[in-house]
Amino acid sequence: MIQLKKGSKKLLNAWAFYDWANSVYTLTIASSIFPLFYSSLFNSKDELVSAFGFQMKQEVLIMLVTAFTFLVVVFLSPILSGIADYVGNKKNFMKFFCYLGSAGCIGLYWFDLNYIHLSLLFYFMGLIGYWGSLVFYNSYLPDIAFEDQQDSISAKGFSMGYIGSVLLLVINLAMVMSQEDEAGAIKMMKYSFITVGIWWALFSQYTFYILPSGVSSGHKVTKYVIFNGFRELKEVWKQLKQNLRLKRYLNAFFVFSMAVQTIMLMAVYFGEKEIDWASDSEKTTGLIVSILVIQLVAIAGAILTSKASSKYGNIKTLIAVNFIWMFLCVYAYFIKTP
């Protein structure tokens, strides 16, 4: 295939299309159906789970595995990105994490408390596959798009991700709600995990077909190359010390991102545990529909925020949005009924 030129429409669309492929993971697995499925495995909200030689609360176990996965990603990202840049095969790394995540999603079909460690391995694979592939996916942007194209194509990727993930969630929602009993609903949830894995791997093929593979350098991977990513981070940190404004921004973003990611990952567990639902069926339907509505509101919110930024500026808009978000988080603390 002819190598597409940097900035070409076809190349940019192929890059953005990966959001369509992988965003189904964050919506179906991380945010909606898997948390409901996981909670349904226990007889009561307070039932403990045994794993790694400890007895702990259900949601604590998932939080610990999630936190560990993020630590692994943080440690591996500089190493793998350094190797990929040196050897010239970032697409292969992106493929590896994509297929790892896809296999993990499909493996969740066999999630069973009797085999909790194997089950958590599948969960770990899905999570690290998603975030690991994003490292290389995002690194492609400056290679394929000119600076004046990057904002628009990133926004297009987010939009495609929203649309694709909502589309599959609607299908999964119909599957779950079509069942008359809890056992049937749980079965459909497990099938939903398979659809996510297949969707992710299948639709990513177009992206992999179009994106450049990179020029192989023929260099061997040495100890120096493996840790070169950390050396680059060290140099970046030295430069940050000289730019006080950028340093403050990154510190603020760290705190902001930590809060947002916590809400995104734990919202359904909170809704399942703290809200007084009339029945399990109402809980399942209510939480999934809530997640779906949130996605639709997010699309409208992104459009309104973009317009507000154009009129009032990014800083003022961001401050206003953060205050609204903080108010809603505090308000959610006092909610007890649907």
Place the predicted regions along the sequence by residue.
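C-terminal membrane-cytosol helix-exit motif in multi-pass small-molecule transporters
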Residues: L168-M177, G197-S217
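Glycine-rich segments within core transmembrane alpha-helices of 12-TM secondary carriers
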Residues: S154-V176
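Hydrophobic core of transmembrane alpha-helices in multi-pass small-molecule transporters
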Residues: G104, Y115-S133, V255, P338
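Helix-to-loop junctions at the C-terminal end of transmembrane segments
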Residues: F75-N89, A300-N314
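Pair of pore-lining "gating" transmembrane helices in MFS-fold secondary transporters
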Residues: K6-K45, F124, N243-I263
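Juxtamembrane intracellular "pre-TM" segments in multi-pass secondary transporters
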Residues: I2-N13, P212-N251
